[in-house]
Curated annotation (Swiss-Prot):
It is found in: Secreted. Residues 22-26 form a propeptide. This is Dermonecrotic toxin LlSicTox-alphaIII3i. It comes from the Eukaryota. Its cofactor is Mg(2+). It catalyses: an N-(acyl)-sphingosylphosphocholine = an N-(acyl)-sphingosyl-1,3-cyclic phosphate + choline; an N-(acyl)-sphingosylphosphoethanolamine = an N-(acyl)-sphingosyl-1,3-cyclic phosphate + ethanolamine; a 1-acyl-sn-glycero-3-phosphocholine = a 1-acyl-sn-glycero-2,3-cyclic phosphate + choline; a 1-acyl-sn-glycero-3-phosphoethanolamine = a 1-acyl-sn-glycero-2,3-cyclic phosphate + ethanolamine. GO terms for biological process: killing of cells of another organism; lipid catabolic process. It comes from Loxosceles laeta. One of its GO terms (cellular component) is extracellular region.
Amino acid sequence: MYVHLALILGCWTVILQGAETDVGERADKRRPIWNLGHMVNAVKQIPTFLNDGANAIEADITFKGAVPTYSYHGTPCDFGRDCIRWEYFDVFLQTLRDYTTPGNSKYYEKFILFVLDLKTGSLNNNEVRKAGENIAKGLLKNYWNNGNNGGRAYVVLSLPDIAHYEFIRRFKEVLKAEGHENLLDKVGYDLSGPYLPSLPSLDSVHEAFRKAGVDGHVWLSDGLTNWAPLGDMARLKEIVERRDSENGFISKVYYWSVDKYSTTRTALDVGVDGIMTNFPYVIIDVLNENGYKDKYRLATYDDNPWETFKK
């Protein structure tokens, strides 16, 4: 009897300890940070950025007409980078799938999100819609494996012009028509431009998302190339303030290109959720510093990239 009672008490102790651990993890109030490797356009660069501490990457997708053809940036680009690294779009997506599919020999558990910087600036309205269709079909086939054990990472589609909201509408229509509407749970959107002659107001950005049929899953970016003066981050602060407002429509805010320790600290102090960098280890180092490690942490797959974390 006493042995039986001891076993019962022992089991309850283990259960309670486990519960305390779960509560502790759920009670972590630190802001999760997405550490985005910048301009990762060649497949050989993917493990390099991941090993340097990135939990997400950004790639530039160029088009021939409405057809996504390469992951490629071109010149000019950030100081110190090779601007002409590239891969065929389909191959790039297939490789991303390898790195984000549990059980694959290349799988990286910490690789949880990628941003496709879609170079649609030269496309007309009809081409923009067709491009949205082609991106949807490309992701469905080459990344999500037609819904059969595809990659698990979240995807952010970043467009350079708020006038290109039809891209998003068509993208969503295609996934629904193909019977994979559920995959939209994995997709977010960024409409952040055009930059010239001046950036659109946040009200105009919000209206573009309404036209796109997007309510939630909004990532909004701001930034400068790494060879430009930092400035006062006024636009970034405005975006963060809008994210945190009662009528905020923004889920996450990210800033680019951040390569310095001082700029990383400033961006975190402003309240960003993500930092795009050429040197992911810099962000990791700052996240481990006194004054930051108690406020911020690297995001994991369990963190919802569409959930707003206010200051």
